[in-house]
Amino acid sequence: MKTLLKAACVASVALVPSVAAAACDEGEVVIKFSHVTNTDKHPKGIAATLLEQRVNDEMNGKACMEVFANSTLYNDDKVLEAMLQGDVQLAAPSLSKFETFTKQFRLFDLPFMFKDIDAVDGFQNSETGQAMKDSMQKRGLQGLAFWHNGMKQMSASKPLLSPEDANGLKFRVQPSDVLVAQMEAIGGSPQKMAFSEVYGALQQGVVDGQENTWSNIFGKKFFEVQDGITETNHGILDYLVVASVDWLDGLDADVRDQLLTILAEVTETRNAEAFAANEQAKANIEAAGGVIRQLDAEQRQAWVDAMKPVWAKFEGDVGADNIAAAQKFNESGS
């Protein structure tokens, strides 16, 4: 194992010599964490930075973590294959990025699956949630922790108060068949597009609207080039911290156990703070002059009725049992 670790160190130094040489001591397990967001404003970036700090403080001499933010090492479309090749040890792609490994995570893209973030939390921390994290083991990946961004809202170049308002509009979506079907269900034209391209596309009218969390809408200033944001809370944008099965199995038990304990503690802390971060982002949008529209119960139900038929199209991929398990956490007191 020491030979493999030395090789990992050499590879890391070759990629970013100044960072690797300064950060890691010889003999430490090098843990490269690749993600696509900034480090200080985005819930995922903040969580990754906290994890890095704690691992390097508490596991000094045993392990060394290096975080590569803003796609400086890999983007989310390439990082999982790089992980299977041993070139990166941890990543946290959005759940739609696991399409080629499992269809079960399509559950989280189904519109109005969860009533709020507490229901999401309950499901992800349940036995079914753990089984979903384990569902890619045969493909060489192990899910370790769900990280929240938050609930998704809708925005466009015109007010969106009813599903009919979306008819004929072009909406940016992540590369997810579920999200494509969701937009088609309300008469929209879904356009798959990288996150980094969205602001310019909205500004230039390449697309008319998008769906995202408050933190993303504020952080990327989408509200500046939209008529307003409608608070729909129709979906969840989350990430899965993942590692390769081979790498995890190759760690000494004490290193693996301590790493997973720290990860669990960081996850609990940052997931709780992600909700507050989104609420602050929402307030910041309003303070900056952005328009936020609320739906009354009747209006919201119209969106539910328009989008919910999407569930039937993907029940075979997601699993009826998983859908039923998720719905239990929408019930009061679950």
Residue ranges and their predicted role:
Residues 23-119, 127-130, 136-334:
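N-terminal secretory/targeting leader peptides
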Residues 1-30, 333-334:
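Short, low-complexity disordered leader/linker segments with a strong preference
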